């Protein structure tokens, strides 16, 4: 099929979907391209971001956790966004696209529940019916978000197949869309999946990096040495990275979930420890068994528990423009506690992975003068029960 935009990032990406979905993807691409050129659409999107979601979000300088080092550390506060995470940005854009295409329903998948909450709030705001697929395990560990979705009128459908996590929810959502695309828009929650989703999601998240660049220049008079973001599918990270890709002096660091440790096999780090394959409509690195089956990923944070990664991240990794590292559950938990106790901010466990790597950079080189920005992609309200149970089991509370 001929596309209006390049469906690949280097060798990664593409449109590996059943033929029945090609017209829906083509319609979506056409709507997106025309919307990007439409001042009325852009004004409506900008208005929602400002007056409904609460943009721009703050860039907060850490006051205490850098003590004894020469690091200056800022947090891009996506946790302050309405809905509690960066997810709200792009769902408002996609919901407006759905209306533009004349759709009346939204289908979504969710892991941590943040994309589900964002999809539910955008659907409620714009008068769209919403059904959300969620792995049964995630329904259990993210009960506050499940209730939030239902409060806003969304139907939450637990998925019991496979590992009962995000990858299975993605499969069910795509299956639903195959039979309902004439009336429904599939609101994919990350910068992955078949073209044009990785491009759409990046463009509807790129204000994160644009604001960060403007704010850091205003506060420090220079660009950061590195911007750091957690990577599951990779939408918050690509939103942060996009405006810095052409700034060679700025390091781009993506942090994958190391789970119980890479050596245990229980992790979610396909970029550095997976193999390229076809999954979820795209060609990208993914966690696979020896015979090519998709392997179960694992992370303490439901939102990073995904066995593949967005194709643009795979490309940035392959050309050496971005560095990808991993952080274990324990390291993320320590960073979570550090930010709570020393800065009075409760971060999402996903974001805690990015913070943990920044703290590692700071502690390994305390004498090094460096300016770092961490994308604090979401707040940790949804994780307090998970953290409580772990700390209680350890006798820390």
UniProtKB/Swiss-Prot annotation:
This protein's assembly is summarised as: Tetramer of two alpha and two beta chains.
Q: What is this protein called?
A: Tryptophan synthase beta chain
Report the superkingdom from the record.
Bacteria
Gene Ontology molecular function: any one: tryptophan synthase activity
Q: What does this protein do?
A: The beta subunit is responsible for the synthesis of L-tryptophan from indole and L-serine.
Q: Which UniProt keywords apply?
A: Amino-acid biosynthesis, Aromatic amino acid biosynthesis, Lyase, Pyridoxal phosphate, Tryptophan biosynthesis
Question: Which protein family is it in?
Answer: Belongs to the TrpB family.
Please list the residues that carry the modification N6-(pyridoxal phosphate)lysine: 87
Q: Name the chemical reaction catalysed here.
A: (1S,2R)-1-C-(indol-3-yl)glycerol 3-phosphate + L-serine = D-glyceraldehyde 3-phosphate + L-tryptophan + H2O
Give the UniProt entry's GO cellular component terms.
cytoplasm
Q: In which pathway does it act?
A: Amino-acid biosynthesis; L-tryptophan biosynthesis; L-tryptophan from chorismate: step 5/5
In its UniProt entry, the species of origin is given as Salmonella arizonae (strain ATCC BAA-731 / CDC346-86 / RSK2980)
Q: Which cofactor does it need?
A: pyridoxal 5'-phosphate
Output the InterPro entries linked to this UniProt entry: Trp_synth_b_CS, Trp_synth_beta, Trp_synth_beta/beta-like, TrpB-like_PALP, TrpB-like_PALP_sf
């Amino acid at each position: 099929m001929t596309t209006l935009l390049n469906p690949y990032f280097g060798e990664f990406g593409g449109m590996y979907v059943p033929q029945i979905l090609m017209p829906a993807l083509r319609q979506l691409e056409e709507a997106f391209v025309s919307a990007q050129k439409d001042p009325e659409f852009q004004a409506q999107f900008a208005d929602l971001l400002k007056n409904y979601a609460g943009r721009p979000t703050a860039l907060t300088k850490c006051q205490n956790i850098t003590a004894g080092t020469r690091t200056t550390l800022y947090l891009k506060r996506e946790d302050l966004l309405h809905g509690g995470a960066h997810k709200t940005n792009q769902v408002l854009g996609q919901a407006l696209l759905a209306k533009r295409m004349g759709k009346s329903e939204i289908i979504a998948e969710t892991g941590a529940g943040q994309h589900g909450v964002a999809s539910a709030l955008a659907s409620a705001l714009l008068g769209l019916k919403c059904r959300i697929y969620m792995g049964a395990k995630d329904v259990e560990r993210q009960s506050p978000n499940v209730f939030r979705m239902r409060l806003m009128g969304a139907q939450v459908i637990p998925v019991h197949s496979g590992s009962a996590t995000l990858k299975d929810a993605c499969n069910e959502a795509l299956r639903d869309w195959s039979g309902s695309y004439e009336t429904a828009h599939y609101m994919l929650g990350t910068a992955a999946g078949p073209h044009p989703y990785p491009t759409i999601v990046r463009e509807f998240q790129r204000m994160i990096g644009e604001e960060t660049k403007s704010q850091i220049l205003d506060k420090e008079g220079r660009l950061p040495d590195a911007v750091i973001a957690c990577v599951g599918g990779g939408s918050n990270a690509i939103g942060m990275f996009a405006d810095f890709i052409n700034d060679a002096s700025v390091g781009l660091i993506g942090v994958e979930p190391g789970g119980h440790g890479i050596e245990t096999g229980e992790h979610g780090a396909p970029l550095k420890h997976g193999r390229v394959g076809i999954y979820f409509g795209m060609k990208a690195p993914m966690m696979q068994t020896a015979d090519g089956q998709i392997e179960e990923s694992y992370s303490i944070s439901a939102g990073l528990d995904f066995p593949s990664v967005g194709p643009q991240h795979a490309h940035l990794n392959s050309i050496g423009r971005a560095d990808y590292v991993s952080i274990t559950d324990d390291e993320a938990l320590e960073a979570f506690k550090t930010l709570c106790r020393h800065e009075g901010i409760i971060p999402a466990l996903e974001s805690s992975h990015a913070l943990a790597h920044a703290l590692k950079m700071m502690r390994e080189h305390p004498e090094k003068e460096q300016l770092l920005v961490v994308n604090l992609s979401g707040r940790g309200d949804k994780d307090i029960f998970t953290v409580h149970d772990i700390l209680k089991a350890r006798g820390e509370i």
